[in-house]
């Protein structure tokens, strides 16, 4: 019996040992029932993940809530502006309130209007255009990347959000009498015609410029400009009409080839960005709905200088030109247009070769030249000797009429400044500060005039002299330049102090979008533009007329 019992116990012990070895992991605890290091590590990772996942959800929720509240608050502020100070003939202390007339509703004029304390002056804005146009995104509108209504803001809405009452007159300035301080304006409304004269103490000329044709025959009547919102509408209609006309001709027909050739003249930001937008429209939208026709479409960009975008760093210019070559945009530099005909343009390449280029649509996006009003104003003042624009001093005062007329924006010929929104914006904000300071000086002079205390008069005189000495000159700070070059890429030449940074590619494209959203005047415009970009991403461009 004893041997049998011993054998049974030994067999049971061996069986228990085997089962224990099978149930344990390779790395195991010496104590049965307790988790090993690997199990502890797995549970630790799971706990950390759950903790950060919950934190991420909370952060997303609070960020979304804060963003929604901010947008709602901004929309409420824009929709419910506070009560304005009404215009009056004088201040409470008896000082006469001066008349400030602003000609134009572009970047310079609107930047001035937004920055100025309009309760200090009787402000009148005169412009044939009753809205502000966000010009940096204008090249995106003809092909439907951005809707035209998304980049406009009514002048009356902007004026209503200022501290003091602002009068707006939908009219065009015709002439100025600098000696009498009067400006002649003419209505542009078809329903009501009038010509009237407005008196001013200060006149701000911010009438912009028009696209120059360099006196090339045939540009007017054959080319489409891209300066105003009406130009973008005309280009969209012309583009759609040309594509439909081309589709009615058989493949390999010379007329079909001509109609499907789109020529853009001008290698500045406007010309480059429109050419890029047009090629995007062909590659990303028409290729889906009209695949055969889209393969025959050709975009040609013509520039008279050796390279496009000459305000950018050379490395960025090279990047843009290489991208155009990849996207099959025919870039022709050192090419000057000599004649424009209804169906073709004649060019001179490298100063040697004459070439005829047939086109279905021609977009003219070259430099600027003064409008008729600016030319009339130049003729009134002998000191205005530059035919390219109004001459101003370093305080933005018009030469020959320094104490009463200012000029800002594209209508001026300011050496070293590009005719960009950035320059006009800074000029407008600077002028608002100057006008505020001038009113403060006038208030001190009025108090000095009405004071009988010699000590007080002496103190006020010192204060006046000090404030006059602090009327700084205009100091332009170049922040850089941005340009969209197609295929969801952009270039950015940024300047911060003495340092410069060059960005390109997708990151620069996101920066380009963010920068322009930040530059918009209202939260309404920001929302509409962001919605347009989102719509294009998911649904494609809407190019319907």
UniProtKB/Swiss-Prot annotation:
Which BP terms in the Gene Ontology apply to this protein?
glycolytic fermentation to ethanol
Pfam families linked:
NDH2_C, Pyr_redox_2
Which GO cellular component terms are attached? mitochondrial intermembrane space; mitochondrion
Report the domain of life of the source organism: Eukaryota
- In chain numbering, the transit peptide falls at 1-21
Which spans of this chain does the record mark as coiled coil? none
Q: Which key words tag this protein in UniProt?
A: FAD, Flavoprotein, Mitochondrion, NAD, Oxidoreductase, Transit peptide
The answer to keyword Mitochondrion applying to this record is yes
Q: Where does FAD bind?
A: 99-129
Instruction: State the Gene Ontology terms under molecular function.
Output: NADH dehydrogenase activity; NADH:ubiquinone reductase (non-electrogenic) activity; oxidoreductase activity
Annotated compartments: Mitochondrion intermembrane space
Q: What is its EC number?
A: 1.6.5.9
Catalyzed chemical reaction(s)? a quinone + NADH + H(+) = a quinol + NAD(+); a ubiquinone + NADH + H(+) = a ubiquinol + NAD(+)
Residues where NAD(+) binds = 260-296
**Known role:** External NADH dehydrogenase required for optimum cellular growth with a number of nonfermentable carbon sources, including ethanol. With NDE1, performes the mitochondrial oxidation of cytosolic NADH under these growth conditions. Regulates the mitochondrial glycerol-3-phosphate dehydrogenase, GUT2, also involved in cytosolic NADH oxidation.
Q: Which family does it belong to?
A: Belongs to the NADH dehydrogenase family.
Q: What is this protein called?
A: External NADH-ubiquinone oxidoreductase 2, mitochondrial
**What is the scientific name of the source organism?**
Saccharomyces cerevisiae (strain ATCC 204508 / S288c)
- Gene symbol here is NDE2
């Amino acid at each position: 019996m004893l041997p049998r019992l011993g054998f049974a116990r030994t067999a049971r012990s061996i069986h228990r040992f085997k089962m224990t070895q099978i149930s344990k992991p390779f790395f195991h605890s010496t104590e049965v029932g307790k988790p090993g290091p690997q199990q502890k590590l797995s549970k630790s990772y799971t706990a950390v993940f759950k903790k950060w996942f919950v934190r991420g959800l909370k952060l997303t929720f609070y960020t979304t809530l804060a963003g929604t509240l901010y947008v709602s608050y901004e929309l409420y502020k824009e929709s419910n502006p506070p009560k304005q100070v009404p215009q009056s003939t004088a201040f409470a202390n008896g000082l006469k309130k001066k008349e400030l007339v602003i000609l134009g509703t572009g970047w310079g004029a609107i930047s001035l209007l937004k920055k100025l304390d309009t309760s200090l002056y009787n402000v009148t804005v005169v412009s044939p255009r009753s809205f502000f146009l966000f010009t940096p995104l204008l090249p995106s509108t003809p092909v439907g990347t951005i809707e035209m209504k998304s980049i406009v803001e009514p002048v009356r809405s902007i004026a209503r959000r200022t501290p003091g009452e602002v009068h707006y007159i939908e009219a065009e300035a015709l002439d100025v009498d600098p000696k009498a301080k009067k400006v002649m304006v003419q209505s542009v409304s078809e329903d009501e015609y009038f010509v009237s004269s407005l008196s001013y103490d200060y006149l701000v000329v911010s009438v912009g410029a028009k696209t120059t044709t360099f006196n090339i025959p045939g540009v007017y009547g054959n080319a489409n400009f891209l300066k105003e919102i009406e130009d973008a509408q005309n280009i969209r209609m012309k583009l759609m009409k040309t594509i439909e006309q081309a589709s009615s001709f058989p493949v390999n027909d010379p007329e079909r080839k001509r109609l499907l050739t789109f020529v853009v003249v001008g290698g500045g930001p406007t010309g480059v960005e429109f050419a890029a937008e047009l090629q995007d429209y062909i590659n990303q939208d028409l290729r889906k709905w009209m695949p055969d026709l889209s393969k025959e479409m050709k975009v040609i960009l013509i520039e008279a200088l050796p390279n496009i975008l000459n305000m950018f760093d050379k490395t960025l210019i090279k990047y843009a030109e290489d991208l155009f070559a990849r996207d099959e945009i025919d870039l022709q530099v050192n090419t000057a247009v000599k004649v424009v005909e209804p169906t073709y343009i004649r060019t001179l390449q490298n100063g040697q070769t004459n070439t005829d280029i047939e086109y279905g649509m021609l977009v003219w996006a070259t430099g600027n030249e003064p409008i008729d009003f600016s030319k009339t104003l130049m003729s009134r003042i002998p000191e205005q000797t530059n035919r390219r624009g109004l001459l101003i001093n370093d305080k933005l005062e018009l030469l020959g009429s320094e104490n009463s007329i200012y000029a800002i924006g594209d209508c001026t010929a300011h050496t070293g400044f590009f005719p960009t929104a950035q320059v006009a914006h800074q000029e407008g904000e600077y002028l608002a500060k100057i006008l505020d300071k001038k009113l403060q000086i006038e208030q001190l002079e009025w108090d000095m005039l009405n004071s009988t205390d010699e000590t007080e008069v002496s103190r006020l005189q010192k204060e006046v002299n000090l404030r006059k000495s602090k009327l700084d000159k205009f100091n332009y700070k170049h922040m850089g330049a941005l340009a969209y070059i197609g295929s969801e890429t952009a270039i950015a030449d940024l300047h911060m102090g003495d340092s410069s940074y060059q960005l390109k590619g997708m990151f620069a494209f996101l920066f380009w979008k963010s920068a322009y959203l930040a530059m918009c005047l209202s939260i309404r415009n920001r929302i509409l533009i962001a919605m347009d970009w989102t719509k294009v991403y998911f649904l494609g461009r809407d190019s319907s007329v």
